[in-house]
Amino acid sequence: TDAPPTEPETTEEREISFDFIEIESETALLTDIDGNELYSKNQYSRIYPASLTKIMTAIVAIEHISDLDEQIMIPGDIYDQIAYENGSTAGFVAYECVTYRDMLYGAVLSSGAECCLTLASYISGSEWEFVELMNSKAKELGMSDTSFTNVCGFQNYEHYSTASDISLLLRYALENDTFYEIFTS
């Protein structure tokens, strides 16, 4: 055979240094795909998770929706709350009929508060009941320093997490095919 010789495969691990990185953020955590820590800065310090909350909102919703293509109507009464909190929207309008799938895309990709509030309303009957599901899921995942008070990430003293807990959540959520498809779109 005239095939060129092949190089032997190597499984040599390389050491990576992050000493040169200056992170402006108060907290940070970088892990590899398996969750092994590569870099951290105050990863256990409490933060307001803001729109990262929507990761939990989306994964809890996905786990409670049986038909992603079912149509639901956006309630009209949610827009006052969004305006009061200066929340972002995905651009849907009151009483518009859309699928659960569209609501999930709007929540994750556009950080749409109307999508999060609509999902919570249809799945649990109220935002508060949905938040209970979120906090139960956080405990189940071992997110030991996380507390949610709303589905959108609106700032509240009792709404907090850590970089470490958010990392746990994201690794879990990315294992779900639907979440992965939406998140990586």
Give the label of every model feature segment:
Residues 165-185:
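Extracytoplasmic
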